């Protein structure tokens, strides 16, 4: 996805951490492995995942509105158009995000006619407005959609209409628009009679030489829709939900600009143990930041939810973002975190809070305020709304306006603080280990053909109890055979041998598995996923059915669910009979039921029974289909919760905590104290260990642990092992000092651990742990942190002096504290003397 004030883990997204938000720096393996030059910034910071209510737009500046657009340019938000409930608007408002002030933007030239449900994008130093709905909504006259294109130049305030020759997109409103590769792209919308799903693009570099082009889309094109958002991330355009009549869904689609192909992204929330996608909705917003898409608001089945949903583009999972605790305290000011303050004892991070609805707590306040107000304002969650608009500046999202309860237009502005950390590479690292087949120590002999597939005992025994038993049986058989042959001393201590540079492969026979589906199963054990086959292709569906059979036999609930999701989503008229027959042959009852129910549907049955494949079905299956059609069985919805099994992270956590002790094959020495571990796991996660085990494997199977010249504490060493085995980044702040340089020294594949260590140090120094951190800073020569700890001790000495750990400090550290106290008292006396003079 937690420790005290910890940052985001690999599970649900949570708030309550103060951060500069983007601690990710370029990963440079040539960087010094010492923390002596570590520079820390002790605030004040904005809280990660904090909502803040900013000054609303006053009526004398601009009306409350909905169905408008907002764009971000430099340090300002620009609001154009919309409606105030009575009339359409075409004013342009500007909100300065630095001083939180509203004003009317300077404009010259002829602006677009008043409109709403238009689109606005930024390209270069201009804003482009396309289409929308115009006319007089009060008298219900002259209402029509537009397909005009206007440019607003921020530098001069000049409005200009682009006159385009040739074919034009049909006039529309409530469409999606974005900029990519110097072009404006528009998709779908409403033309006054029907919803659309066509796409058009136009170059924005030179209006004299450009024209509209219709895009030939392919793939799984979204249904015709309107009132939906689009966002670009990872060179792809994403579309989520929207109004599609009877076809409205909560599907997420992605569009590849290069080959102009759409793909519907499958959801696997049951399998991954993550929350489901947001409800289907319309009138919502979606913005992109880092590798995430953020969806807020909209109308979802007659409700106005105010949860913020986050989609991870890399891992294809949805999460509900938990707001920081200070988002929920009305009237609270943002606390300062200055290192010179005597309130340094308040440097604790807030506990992670569970999400609460705020619409019943916070009322709407549109009272008149000045156009410029202090930054430190009441922190509140925005209420649910639709037809609002959102934009991103730096590391924050700004949401303005919209329609709230009782059809009231809003003039509120809210700010949401993003988080940004390097992604977890755990699954990728183990995937590379599987693909590379280095350090394999087990060979599975499969089926009657005795095909061989190699793997790693540590990964396999961590993920599958069934395969673990087979491996243990093979080890016991081999040990007995060697003992009978006289190759093993009878009195040798039990347990795995360590230190062999190239131990022989352990052979494990599995007669019930064939090589190809078993390799897919192995890929899942290493990565928690399988590479998606071609959807609907009979060969691929049958392969996954074989994998499904193995998952049932090996009791891999997680893989079982994944296979079922893929197969059920892939069943269509072309392959249903083949899949049904295969399911009957493999005795896969649930899949067979799914196929039978698919066949006997009114819209499918006549087509299926006229196929040639139907004539070749076995007689019992034909009889079952006919009887199912004549007398469908009663539906019995199951209330049984779905068992999704354990994840890779959960299994590796249990493995480190003791479940894998009998399979250790390397010993790590910390100050002479042994810690058994697993070579394959260390090599997968660290290029340092990979190179050592490949070329410089110690003969005695023991590796001394240090980080450069420094030996970490036992506690910090265990924190590092937790990161290596299952990607855990939460740890006590003192551990972060030891491990700050670990990503460079041990060659981790990105600086995720370092980013969390840096934030942990900046955030979580308190009176309660300052002495432990002082000791760690002294040992690691982290001078910046040591000065900060001494500063806190001096200003909070009354509290620190009562801590029992003070009496356990070394003599030198006690002298450092006395020196700092003397200096502080001297400076204070000088200041008082100067004031008296």
UniProtKB/Swiss-Prot annotation:
Positions of the BTB domain: 440-534, 664-733
GO BP annotation list: negative regulation of Ras protein signal transduction; protein ubiquitination
Gene: Lztr1
Identification of the protein by name: Leucine-zipper-like transcriptional regulator 1
N-acetylalanine modification, residue list: 2
Domain of life according to the entry: Eukaryota
GO molecular function, one term: small GTPase binding
Subcellular location: Endomembrane system; Recycling endosome; Golgi apparatus
Record's keyword terms, sorted: Acetylation, Endosome, Golgi apparatus, Kelch repeat, Membrane, Phosphoprotein, Repeat, Ubl conjugation pathway
Pfam families: BTB (PF00651), Kelch_1 (PF01344), Kelch_KLHDC2_KLHL20_DRC7 (PF24681)
Region (Disordered): 324-352
Tissue specificity comment: Widely expressed.
């Amino acid at each position: 996805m937690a420790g005290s004030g910890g940052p985001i883990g690999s599970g649900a997204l949570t708030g309550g951490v103060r951060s500069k938000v983007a601690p990710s720096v370029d990963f440079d393996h040539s960087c010094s492995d010492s923390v002596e030059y570590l520079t820390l910034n002790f605030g004040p910071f904005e809280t990660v995942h904090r909502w803040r209510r900013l000054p609303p737009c006053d009526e004398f500046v601009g009306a409350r509105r909905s169905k408008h657009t907002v764009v971000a340019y430099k340090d300002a938000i620009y609001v154009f158009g919309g409606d105030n409930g009575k009339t359409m608007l075409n004013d342009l408002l500007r909100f300065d995000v630095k001083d939180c002030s509203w004003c009317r933007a300077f404009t010259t030239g002829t602006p677009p006619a008043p409109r709403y449900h238009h689109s606005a994008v930024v390209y270069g130093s201009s804003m482009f407005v396309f289409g929308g709905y115009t006319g007089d909504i009060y008298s219900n006259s002259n209402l029509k959609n537009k397909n005009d294109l206007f440019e607003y130049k921020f530098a001069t305030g000049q409005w200009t209409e682009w006159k385009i020759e040739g074919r034009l997109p049909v006039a529309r409103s409530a469409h999606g628009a974005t900029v990519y590769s110097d072009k404006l792209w528009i998709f779908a919308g409403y033309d006054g009679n029907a919803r659309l799903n066509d796409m058009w693009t136009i170059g924005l570099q030179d209006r004299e030489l450009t024209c509209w082009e219709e895009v030939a889309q392919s793939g799984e094109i979204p249904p015709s829709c309107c009132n939906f958002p689009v966002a670009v991330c990872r060179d792809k355009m994403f579309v989520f939900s929207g109004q599609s009549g009877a076809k409205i869904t909560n599907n997420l689609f992605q569009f590849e600009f290069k080959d102009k192909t759409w793909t519907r992204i499958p959801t696997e929330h049951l399998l991954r143990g993550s929350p489901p996608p947001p409800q289907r909705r319309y009138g919502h917003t979606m913005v992109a930041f880092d590798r995430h898409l953020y969806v807020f608001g909209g109308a979802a089945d007659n409700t106005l939810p105010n949860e913020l949903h986050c989609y991870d583009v890399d891992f294809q999972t949805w999460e509900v973002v938990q707001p920081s605790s200070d988002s929920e305290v009305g009237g609270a000011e943002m606390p300062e975190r200055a290192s010179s303050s005597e309130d340094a004892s308040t440097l604790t991070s807030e506990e992670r809070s569970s999400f609460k609805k705020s619409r019943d707590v916070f009322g709407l306040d549109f009272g008149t305020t000045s156009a410029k107000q202090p930054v430190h304002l009441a922190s509140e969650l925005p209420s649910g709304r639709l037809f609002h608009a959102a934009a991103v500046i730096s590391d924050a999202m700004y949401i303005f306006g919209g329609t709230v309860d009782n059809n009231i237009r809003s003039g509120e502005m809210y700010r949401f603080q993003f988080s940004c950390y390097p992604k977890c590479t755990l699954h990728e690292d183990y995937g590379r280990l599987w693909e590379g087949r280095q350090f394999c120590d087990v060979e599975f002999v499969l089926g009657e053909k005795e095909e061989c597939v190699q793997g790693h005992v540590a990964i396999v025994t961590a993920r599958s109890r069934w395969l673990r038993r087979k491996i243990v049986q093979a080890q016991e058989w081999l040990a007995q055979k060697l003992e009978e042959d006289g190759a093993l001393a009878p009195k040798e201590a039990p347990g795995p041998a360590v230190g062999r540079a190239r131990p022989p492969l352990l052979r494990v026979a599995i007669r019930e598995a064939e090589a190809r589906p078993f390799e897919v199963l192995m890929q899942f054990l290493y990565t928690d996923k399988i590479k998606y086959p071609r959807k609907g292709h009979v060969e691929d569906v049958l392969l996954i059915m074989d994998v499904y059979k193995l998952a049932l036999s090996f009791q891999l609930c997680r893989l079982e669910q994944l296979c079922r999701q893929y197969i059920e989503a892939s069943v269509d008229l072309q392959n249903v009979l083949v899949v049904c027959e295969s399911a009957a042959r493999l005795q896969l009852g649930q899949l067979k039921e799914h196929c039978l129910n698919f066949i006997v549907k009114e819209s499918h049955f006549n087509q299926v029974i006229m196929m040639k494949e139907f004539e070749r079905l076995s007689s019992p299956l034909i009889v079952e289909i006919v009887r199912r059609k004549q007398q469908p069985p009663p539906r019995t919805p199951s209330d049984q919760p779905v068992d999704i099994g354990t994840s890779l992270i959960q299994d590796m956590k249990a493995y480190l905590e003791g479940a894998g002790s009998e399979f250790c094959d390397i010993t790590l020495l910390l100050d002479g104290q042994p810690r058994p571990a697993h070579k394959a796991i260390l090599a997968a996660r660290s290029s340092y260990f990979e190179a050592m085990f490949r070329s410089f494997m110690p003969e005695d199977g023991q590796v001394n642990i240090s980080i450069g010249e420094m030996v970490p504490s036992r506690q910090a060493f265990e924190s590092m092992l937790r990161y290596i085995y299952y990607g855990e980044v939460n740890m006590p702040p003192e551990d972060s000092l030891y491990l700050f340089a670990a990503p460079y020294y041990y060659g981790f594949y990105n600086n995720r651990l370092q980013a969390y260590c840096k934030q942990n140090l900046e955030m979580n120094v308190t009176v309660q742990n300052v002495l432990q951190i002082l000791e760690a800073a002294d040992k690691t020569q982290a001078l910046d942190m040591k000065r900060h700890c001494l500063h806190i001790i001096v200003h909070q000495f009354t509290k620190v002096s009562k801590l029992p750990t003070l009496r356990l400090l070394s003599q030198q550290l006690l002298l450092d504290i006395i020196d700092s106290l003397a200096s502080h008292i001297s400076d204070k006396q000088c200041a008082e003397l100067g004031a008296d003079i």
